[in-house]
Amino acid sequence: MAFPTTSAQQAETNRKILEEIQTKKQLLAGGIINLGLSPANQMPAPQLLGQPTTVNPDFQAGVGIATNATSTARSAFNPTSSTTLGFFIPQDSYFGNSFIPVLPRLEPLPSPATTPTTPNAPPSHNISK
């Protein structure tokens, strides 16, 4: 069972919490804080649009899959890329995805109700009683 705190104690606690939050905000804004991530497992900085991209040397030009990829990834990549309508973009993923599928947008087939009729088509025969 928690004991009720006096308003002075509550105000002091709130002030300390707010000071701590303000300090963390300043550290984050300044880029000084380390979130406990080692350099090996930090995500790369996001690239802004319009900036030139750098090519990862782990990917061979024209081959399409990383040289450090597992044999399972290579064996899945080669037949898949040759038998699909789309193509694959190789990537250096921290999540285990060695390539991203890119599928083309296909126009839907027209339904029979919306198919235009040709002007030279024979008239339909209606039998009336």
UniProtKB/Swiss-Prot annotation:
Taxonomic superkingdom: Eukaryota
Positions of the UniProt region annotated as Disordered: 105-129
A GO cellular component annotation in the UniProt record: nucleoplasm
Pfam families per the UniProt record, alphabetical: SOSSC
An annotated GO BP: DNA repair
Entry's family note: Belongs to the SOSS-C family.
PANTHER family cross-referenced by the UniProt entry: SOSS COMPLEX SUBUNIT C
Name listed for the protein in its UniProt record: SOSS complex subunit C homolog
Organism name: Drosophila erecta
